[in-house]
Regions:
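A composition-driven surface/loop motif
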Residues: 4-262
């Protein structure tokens, strides 16, 4: 676990395995955070501060966390590099957690974990993100693959733990373009920390095809607690999602993906 009020990563190859938070930009101490482990109460939670900043400008970062994967009590900025978060399996934590907002402007971001406190990138982010939700948790090692309209793999990833949500952002996800999200199946590529390169993806089940209409676009039928941060990230657009502001469900309800039941 790395706890400092301000954390900036510009380069390097970093791998973190933590029973609690992976990176935590907080004014609290390690002892404070240990006392709030799994509950995110006390000094590690709620004390929003403009002094707390987590900047990722480059490098390769892999985080396997039992608590929040990336946590900032202020702003989180991701502008480059490759960031992979194998986040929590419990709904009391999130793969990403900020006090105010998460700004994504570049790089590759993959953050998998539970859905109860999943936080999305801000709607002011300049690089689009797909927020993929599953109504039931999927087993560790289940592949999630995003393909563009030409059937080319954009991201092929398999978390190391069970998960019900994945946040994916990449320079190859372009606003206004359509993308198909598959789960299951297999890949002949080479995996590092669950992220596949090269090879062919096959045998998966189509979850949904969506258009990246805004900074954050939701796919799938999973619901999100959206309780992680104080300021919260952006709310996902379209695709039959619950409208928490107005307390409304879509008229036609949710469409359950093939092979999954309510």
């Amino acid at each position: 676990m790395c706890i400092r009020d301000s954390i900036t990563i510009n380069d390097g190859n970093i791998s973190v395995t933590a029973s609690d938070d992976g990176f935590n930009a907080s004014e609290g101490s390690a002892d404070d955070d240990a006392e709030s482990s799994g509950q995110n109460i006390g000094k590690g939670f709620g004390d929003v501060s403009e002094n707390c900043i987590l900047n990722i400008n480059g490098g390769y970062i892999y985080v396997n966390a039992g608590g929040d994967g990336l946590d900032s009590n202020g702003v989180m900025n991701i502008s480059g590099g490759t960031v992979i978060v194998d986040g929590p399996v419990n709904d009391g934590n999130g793969a990403l957690d900020s006090g105010t907002e998460i700004n994504v402007s570049g790089g590759i971001l993959i953050a998998a974990g539970s859905s109860g406190m999943a936080e999305f990138p801000s709607d002011t982010s300049t690089q689009p993100s797909l927020v993929v939700g599953f109504e039931q948790s999927l087993d560790a090692g289940t592949i999630v693959c995003v393909q563009n309209k030409n059937g080319e793999n954009i991201i092929t990833y398999s978390p190391s733990k069970k998960f019900s949500s994945v946040i994916i952002s990449s320079p190859d996800i372009i606003q206004g373009e359509s993308y198909s999200i598959y789960y299951g199946g297999s890949s002949s590529g080479t995996a590092k920390d669950g992220l596949y390169s090269g090879g062919e993806y096959s045998g998966g089940t189509l979850l949904e095809t969506v258009t990246a209409e805004s900074a954050v676009t939701q796919a799938g039928t999973g619901t999100f607690g959206q309780m992680g941060g104080i300021g919260r990230g952006g709310m996902p657009g379209n695709n039959g999602s619950f409208d928490p502001e107005n307390g409304e469900m879509p008229d036609n309800g949710f469409t359950h993906p093939e092979g999954m039941t309510p």
